[in-house]
Amino acid sequence: MYSAHSHQEGPGTPPTVDCWVFDVDGCLVDSLTGTSLRPGARELLTHLGRDSRVNLWSAGGGAYARSRAEQFCLDGHVSGYFPKEGRDAEGRYLTSHLPVDTGRAVFVDDRPEDLAGDLEVLAVSPYLAEDPHDHGLEAVALRAGLSRDELR
């Protein structure tokens, strides 16, 4: 996995990103009740959706991911919705069904161990319940070019 802290182009750093792939439950939406959006998620997706594709994927399926985006009025910033379907021999989710160049995509997930090691994955702490003091998306915001102040 690439480091979330590398911002300069050069050997060993990630290429320009044109797609962001976010897990839904536990990453953007609380996983216990599904009723709260993680602090900063709206600002982050709004920012990313201006210049990049933003995809949501979920073990609950693409329709489920879409319904969560609509629930929180995020659907205007999202390009596509996909299921997390199938795993490889090592138990990691397959990404071949996603319309992304995995070398130019960033995956954001609270279960980074479920993704292949050759992907750029930004791990976030699990968002379990509504918490207005949560800072779980800060590293993602920094990678996306947002300051902490812009995230709130």
Please annotate each region the language model reported.
Residues 16-18, 52-53, 102-105:
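Short coil/turn segments at beta-strand junctions that form active-site/ligand-binding loops
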Residues 1-22:
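Non-catalytic pre-domain segments flanking phosphatase-related domains
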Residues 20-31:
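Metal-dependent nucleic-acid phosphoesterase active-site entry motif
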Residues 30-55, 85-92:
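Short, acidic loop-to-helix structural element flanking the phosphoryl-transfer center
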Residues 21-23, 56, 107:
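Short hydrophobic beta-strand that contains or immediately precedes a catalytic carboxylate
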Residues 58-60:
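Conserved phosphate-coupling serine/threonine residues in phosphotransfer and NTP-handling enzymes
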Residues 66-152:
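C-terminal cap/substrate-recognition subdomain and adjoining C-terminal extension
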Residues 36, 63-64:
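Short alpha-helical
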